[in-house]
Structures are given as structure tokens and as C-alpha cells.
Amino acid sequence: MRDGTATKNKINRVAMELFAEKGVTETTTKDIAAGAGIAEGTIYRHYKSKDELVKKLFLSLYEEQGNYLHEIASADKDSKQKIADMIVNFCQLFAEDKALFTFLLLTQHGQLKEVPDDMVTPVVVLRDLIAQGQDDGTIKQGDPDLMAAMVLGVVVQPAVFHVYGRLTQDYKSFTQDLTEAAWSIVGLDE
């Protein structure tokens, strides 16, 4: 008997791409089923509703990105290099899988309230890296939550501009500028 994992993965990928392209509201389960090459009812074997699909997909992808950044933050490198590596990672993944980041960017406001307190998230990883750098004296003092928000703004807002066509260059070409701006925020630009 099949376990349905391949079908669920196909549903998730097609849904993510359609949500990124058309928006969550405009995407129907019929659209997802057609894109995945399955019957619409098959979606309901995996999810109770489109809302549950959006929530679970967001949480899964958001946690996946948090875990990936946690690996970078856990490396035996200094804070400056860890922040640079995180931004390189973001720019590369955005360029390679724009649908994933578009989905996360465009659905985050409706989904962040669903994030469990104990989940490893990009925000928590960055905030903790900044706080650790402040403790060891490599990052300037200040509110680590505010600094994390500012660094994320430096990286995420250009991605939003890219999604909406205001920036059209290869996203990886922004890596150095974004890295230097992030370093400046946390006092690593010297």
C-alpha cells in the first residue's frame, strides 16, 4: 500500500507555486488538483481544507528555513561570517526557488501568529546570533530584536521589490550590498 508521501509532496509543491503566482485567495483546490494531476478529493486525504494546507505548508517551510539558518549559526565561524553566509544562502535560494520565498513572503502576515513558541525560525536564529555576538563583544549593543528586524528588513524588502518587479536583476547580484548593509546595522562594518 502506498503511503501518499509523493502525492502530498506534489500537492505541496504545486500549491506553493500557485499561491506564489496567483495568491492564496485566488488559488482554488481545483487549480491545485489540476496542477498536480490528481482528483480534487485527493487533496482532502492530506488536508482538511485549503486553509490547513496553507498553514501547514507555511509552518513546514518556515521551520525548514529556520533549521537551515541554525546550521549556519552553529558553524565554527565568527558572527560577521555567519551573517554573510546567511545572506548568501538567502540570495542563492531566492534566485533558485523564487516560488518558495514568494510564498513565505506573501503569506507570512496571515501565518506568523500560528508559529509555535518553540519552533526554530529564521527570526529566532538571527536574534540569538545577534544576542550571542553582543555577549561576546563582537556585535554592538542594542535591542537584539530590533536589530534582527532591521537585518531582516534589509534582506526581505528587496526580495519583495523583486517579487513585484521593481528590482529585476539576478537576486544574487545584491548579495554584497545586502551583506554590507546588515553588517552596518550590527556594527560589523569596521
Q: What does each model-identified segment do?
A:
Residues 79, 92, 124-136, 168-190:
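C-terminal peripheral helix-coil segments that are non-catalytic and often amphipathic
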Residues 56, 70-96, 147-151:
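Hydrophobic alpha-helical connector segments
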Residues 20, 45-48, 60:
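Base-recognition residues in the alpha-helical recognition helix of bacterial helix-turn-helix
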Residues 1-22, 26-35, 52-55:
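Basic, helix-initiating cap at the start of DNA-binding domains
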Residues 36-47:
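Short hydrophobic/aromatic patch on the recognition helix
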Residues 59-66:
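Short, basic, alpha-helical segments at the C-terminal edge of helix-turn-helix-like DNA-binding modules
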Residues 66, 111-136, 145-149, 176:
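Amphipathic alpha-helical packing segments from all-alpha helical-bundle domains
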Residues 102-106, 135-181:
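Hydrophobic/aromatic-rich alpha-helical bundle segments in the mid-to-C-terminal region
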